[in-house]
């Protein structure tokens, strides 16, 4: 099984790689589009500014590749943090267009008493869909 992590120039790539390694996988950090070929899973991490990560993806040619869903029809794409937001059309927190793989726009929190970004650990409970991760830390 080939697991690829896109080097989006943002995100905690080392932590993601370490977690996948801990689970017994051998993830590959990809710096160019060609590295994604024949991936079973593609992780798109990102931290910080929506626009910054989009610009990084464009600079490395990942943006155009990811916009064309047919390029990874046989792969599962998983967005983490800002990487998940990039899958949508756009964000109220930026001017760049998203990948438009999912319909919708990322909205800014309007509630003032929510601490953003949320930092720290939470309890996570799996379900049958994620049974291979059940009980793993």
List each language-model region with its residue ranges.
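Cysteine-nucleophile active-site neighborhood
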Residues: 48-118
């Amino acid at each position: 099984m080939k697991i690829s992590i896109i080097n989006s120039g943002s995100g905690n790539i080392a932590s993601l790689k370490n977690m996948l390694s801990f689970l017994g996988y051998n993830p590959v950090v990809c710096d160019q589009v060609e590295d994604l070929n024949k991936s079973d899973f593609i992780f798109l991490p990102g931290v910080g500014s929506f626009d910054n990560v989009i610009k990084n993806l464009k600079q490395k040619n990942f943006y155009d590749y990811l916009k064309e869903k047919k390029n990874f029809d046989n792969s599962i794409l998983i967005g983490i943090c800002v990487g998940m937001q990039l899958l949508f059309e756009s964000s109220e927190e930026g001017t760049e267009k998203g990948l438009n793989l999912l319909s919708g726009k990322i909205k800014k929190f309007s509630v003032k008493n929510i601490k953003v970004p949320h930092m720290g650990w939470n309890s996570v409970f799996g379900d049958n869909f994620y049974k291979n991760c059940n009980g793993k830390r």
